[in-house]
Amino acid sequence: MNTPYSIEHLLNPALRNIATYKVEGGQQAEIKLNQNESPFDVPQWLKEEIIGEFIREPWNRYPDILPYRAMEAYANFVGVPAECVIMSNGSNEMLYTIFLACLGPGRKVLIPNPSFSLYEKLALLLQSDIVEVPMKSDLSFDVEAIMKAAHNEAVDVIVLSNPNNPTSTSMSYDAVRKIAESTQALVLVDEAYIEFSRERSMVDTIEELPNVVVLRTMSKALALAGIRIGFALANAPLMAEISKPKIPFASSRLAEITLMKVLANYRLVDEAVSAILSERDALYEQLRMMEGVSPFASDTNFLIVRVADANATFKRLYDKGILVRNVSGYHLMEGCLRCNVGLPEENRRLAEAFAELSVEVKG
């Protein structure tokens, strides 16, 4: 009998500390509210316009090393020089790129806890030291604790998901700026949900503050999760360095054309965001009146809802065809579910399901 071949010696030892990414409950449901996507698809007429232009492109040729036309369009859209912008295959690609550029064995990254799980995964893969700073009990950022830990631990990178996933809370513009001005560390501000926020973006600081990098995604407000488009923004000298590990040719011509067409029709995004915010606030008001159901005020396109038994409630919702995200395993989020805002009918069904739970709590 042959001895089983062990592959362990072939692998980076850091993989022992990393789990494969999974979406609990899968990605298919009658009412899908678990991945913070926009409930509004790109309209058919705009899809046809995009595909019509893409068909005329040569498919046998590589795209540009970087999608320069789309980068210039986005730079003009946000009001910064084109050399301060880089486009990626989703913002996660630039997250990988920036971590590769700035972290490694013996280097330190500060991450508020809880926050987006990919930050920790990448830091572990790169064998960097993680400095965790707990959020406050109301799931708000502890700004003073962040600055103190950054100084005492001499961290190399500070990562701020702002607004924060999974808590749905934000740090003020002034607070983010205060952190950036108080440290020599790179301050990476992940603004995946900024279009839904009451707070100002940090984009207008990138040429003034030499250590600030802003991440943006087109997967949420712009409804392009299936196309995979993200951006990083930083001052030109910093951008030139942190983009060195980036994979060339990572953005397709389809992504470039799509981005430019959506920006040219941005009123569609504005209308969708307005509708989502209206639904978010209405859903929050409904849920907070229910006994045994405690929603947190949100600055994103999702609500965090605390219940007595998150696991049981997740299953009951799933059995009703409603898929949400169980985030009860995160620090400070015991009993919590994450529900992104859907279409009006989907939100009505979700509220009805929570209302049934509330009636049972009353007994």
From Swiss-Prot:
<keyword id="KW-0032">Aminotransferase</keyword>
<keyword id="KW-0368">Histidine biosynthesis</keyword>
<dbReference type="GO" id="GO:0004400">
    <property type="term" value="F:histidinol-phosphate transaminase activity"/>
</dbReference>
<dbReference type="InterPro" id="IPR015424">
    <property type="entry name" value="PyrdxlP-dep_Trfase"/>
</dbReference>
<keyword id="KW-0028">Amino-acid biosynthesis</keyword>
<dbReference type="InterPro" id="IPR005861">
    <property type="entry name" value="HisP_aminotrans"/>
</dbReference>
<dbReference type="InterPro" id="IPR004839">
    <property type="entry name" value="Aminotransferase_I/II_large"/>
</dbReference>
<keyword id="KW-0808">Transferase</keyword>
<keyword id="KW-0663">Pyridoxal phosphate</keyword>
<protein>
    <recommendedName>
        <fullName>Histidinol-phosphate aminotransferase</fullName>
        <ecNumber>2.6.1.9</ecNumber>
    </recommendedName>
</protein>
<comment type="similarity">
    <text>Belongs to the class-II pyridoxal-phosphate-dependent aminotransferase family. Histidinol-phosphate aminotransferase subfamily.</text>
</comment>
<dbReference type="InterPro" id="IPR001917">
    <property type="entry name" value="Aminotrans_II_pyridoxalP_BS"/>
</dbReference>
<dbReference type="Pfam" id="PF00155">
    <property type="entry name" value="Aminotran_1_2"/>
</dbReference>
<dbReference type="InterPro" id="IPR015421">
    <property type="entry name" value="PyrdxlP-dep_Trfase_major"/>
</dbReference>
<dbReference type="GO" id="GO:0000105">
    <property type="term" value="P:L-histidine biosynthetic process"/>
</dbReference>
<comment type="subunit">
    <text>Homodimer.</text>
</comment>
<dbReference type="GO" id="GO:0030170">
    <property type="term" value="F:pyridoxal phosphate binding"/>
</dbReference>
<dbReference type="InterPro" id="IPR015422">
    <property type="entry name" value="PyrdxlP-dep_Trfase_small"/>
</dbReference>
<comment type="pathway">
    <text>Amino-acid biosynthesis; L-histidine biosynthesis; L-histidine from 5-phospho-alpha-D-ribose 1-diphosphate: step 7/9.</text>
</comment>
<feature type="modified residue" description="N6-(pyridoxal phosphate)lysine">
    <location>
        <position position="220"/>
    </location>
</feature>
